[in-house]
Amino acid sequence: MDKIANAFKDKKANIGYIVAGYPSLEYSKEFLNLLDDSILDMIEIGIPYSDPLADGKLIANAAFQACNNGVNTARVFDMLKGVKTSKALVFLVYYNI
């Protein structure tokens, strides 16, 4: 939680977003590792979901393609084991009741 609090300390935070697994999990891992040298304070990682009603068309299409490639929550967290970053990571996930 310290990384998140520090991202907002005395300034506005720069937050990036990526749909995990788009276009592939390997690409996502490499991209996230490169972002460590960016101006971002925090990275929001979208966990793909088959019916992302709250997202716009671009994010929905990326999530749909990732899901079609077999990306799920467990595979995203397995991929993240290979990510080395000093940035705060937060997640966007869906939950149906």
Task: List each model region and its residues.
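A conditional alpha-helix N-cap/helix-loop micro-motif detector
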Residues: 1, 25, 69-73
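N-terminal amphipathic alpha-helix/helix-capping segment at the start of soluble metabolic enzymes
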Residues: 1-18, 79-81
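Hydrophobic faces of well-ordered beta-strands that scaffold small-molecule active sites
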Residues: 14-18, 41-45, 89-93
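Short, acidic/polar
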Residues: 25-35
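Glycine-rich, proline-tolerant flexible connector loops at the mouths of alpha/beta enzymes
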Residues: 41-71
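Glycine/small-residue-rich loop that forms an oxyanion/phosphate-binding "nest" at active or ligand-binding sites
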Residues: 60-97
